Amino acid sequence: VATMVAGCGGSSDTTSADNSNSGVAATATESGSDAAETDTTGDEGKVFNIYCWNEEFKSRLTDHYPGYEEVDATTGKIGDVTVKWNITPSDDNAYQNNLDATLLKQESAAADDKIDLFLVEADYALKYVDTDYTMPIADLGITDADLANQYQYTKDIVTDSNGVLKGVSWQGCPGVLFYNRDAAKEVLGTDDPDEVQKYVSDWDTFNDTAETMKAAGYKMTSSVNDTYRVYSNNVTSKWVEDGKINIDDNIMKWVSDSKELYDAGETETYELWGDDWKKGFYPEGKVFCYFGPAWFVNFSMAADTEGSIGYNGGWGATPGPQGFYWGGTWICGATGTDNASLVKDIILKMTTDETIMKDIVVKDDDFVNNKPAMEAMAADTSYQSKVLGGQNPLSMYCASVEKLDLSNLSAYDQGCNEEF
């Protein structure tokens, strides 16, 4: 795991790219081929170790998994099994470094110290699923029929190079454009989602609207970085081809469009998550729009802070210039777990139980990985997002998720995207 590729680091050296790939293959070979032979029967352990980078999955399990009891901030109980949460933030790659070091010791670790379940993100999922440290989902006794209602892209992201599914997610993360309703009414004369979409339907139209927004005193986006995910999700080639770094035409279009907007004073160059970038979450920030999936509304837009646009239900949602996805969390069973039955049950309940899925949508405003649940909620007129002024955005999420193309996903995405 220590030599697994975490990205291309901006290097265009052919040897470097080739060596990174061989490192993945070497690690998989060295770890053995026991994953396919893992015994999920017999006596199970009394300590269940979960590795993750934030509180999101912990809150989902606490709130929605039947029988989960919270003991303290890092401990829970499921029946007579003690659940231990090992939460390491992702800053400076700390989570992956900690996970890698622990997985290297997995085979020789004491039963109560073995990782049972760990989480991965889309940008680096292949780093883990292309090794034997992740269990094939089928080896847990989970069938294709069990997962039939899940969105295909969520399976593609955690399918290894041999076509074996190695992880499952409870959520989907299709993205949309969130716009400031007051700014839309003031500048465009309407805050109706269908009407606003006409002003952001493609990048040329989006850029024209940016000029109109500037004239009215608004930035189109808080930063050029707000649009990067949308462009990078719509590439027609991979970051590394034939052992060489490749910059897709759509990435270069982001560069040229962003420079044009910045030079015209229609956006800024703030880093995502920084204080300056967040100013647009408030009316005085004078920002027209942001891009994001369902989790962005809950975790990133200061919706719980009095005086923010979200607190007052002042955002609206519309599809925007192109469909995209951003983030998502996948559950992986760790090879060597002595709690395979519990791993299986958590995956099945948290990612396939339609009642639990709907409960997550209602209570957490999440977009869940269950087609029937999402289609039912999208048609439910009683479901409204407070942050979005009572709008039900689920139908546009449903439409967006079906169009996602992950054919150009690669193990180099995290590093190359971050360096670029």
Features from the language model and the residues they span:
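C-terminal lobe and pocket-closing loops
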Residues: 299-305, 321-325, 332-419
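A local structural motif
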Residues: 46, 73-91, 110-112, 190-197, ...
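Short helix-initiation/N-cap motifs at beta->coil->alpha
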Residues: 87-104, 201-205, 269-283
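Extracytoplasmic/periplasmic substrate-binding proteins
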Residues: 58-59, 66, 253-345
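Helix-loop-helix "hinge/cap" segment bordering the ligand-binding cleft or interdomain interface
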Residues: 138-148, 156-227, 239-272, 335-341
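Structural recognition of the beta-strand scaffold that forms the well-ordered cores
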Residues: 49-52, 85-86, 116-120, 167-170, ...
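Hinge/lid segment of periplasmic solute-binding proteins
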Residues: 93-96, 107, 111, 118-176, ...
